[in-house]
Amino acid sequence: MRDIKIFYPSDVKLHMDALESFNVPLNVPMIDLNEGYSSCEICVTFGVPKKAGHRGELVKKIFDEHKGRHLIIEKGYINRDVYYAIGWDGINGRSNFNNKNSPTGRWDQLNLSGFKTWAHNNSSKIIVCGQVPWDASVQHINFTEWCIKIIEVLKDCGDVVFRPHPLDHGSVKFLM
């Protein structure tokens, strides 16, 4: 087996539980983020470095020292309380999930009923979905400014509706 180490935050139960479960078949060393980096070929973390918060700083130190591949675990995109996304060297669209040409079986097993085919008609609204400004996926931009600009551009294409993230309590309310 390759040299794999899992770096965990001892103060975030959700992250700890996910990483421990991930480690069951691997049985590789787990190292508290507070202990710092330990050399390995593959580094596993829950999430990526964040500009905000102590945990984000600790993960950044691990990323800065590690020269090999990163396997990153994050909460999934659907049924987020049940599923996780696991990808190489990034999150969201910047990760390699090794899912090219995957069969539809896993997707079909989700039995998701709320999804409809894409509707193309002139009466549809364009929905811009918000994000909490401290999320790692938007930490590299001014998210409020981005929302303002993208809504302005999209207004030429039809009615735009902004929906804030359910956990965002006010940072972009003026867009609604």
Predicted features, each with a name:
Residues H15-N23, A52-V59, I141-V153:
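Well-ordered, non-membrane alpha-helical segments in soluble/globular domains
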Residues D11-A18, A52-R55, R80, A136-S137, ...:
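Short, charged/polar "capping" segments at the starts of alpha-helices
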Residues D3, S123-I127, D159:
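Charged active-site motifs of nucleotide-sugar-dependent glycosyltransferases
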Residues G68-H140:
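A nucleotide-sugar donor-handling region in carbohydrate enzymes
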Residues F7-S10, C147-M176:
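Catalytic donor nucleotide-activated moiety binding site of glycosyltransferases and closely related
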Residues M1-K50, W134-D135:
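N-terminal pre-catalytic "stem/leader" segment of glycosyltransferase-like enzymes
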Residues F46, I73-K75, R163:
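Generic beta-sheet signal
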Residues K51-N79:
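A short, gly/pro- and small-residue-rich
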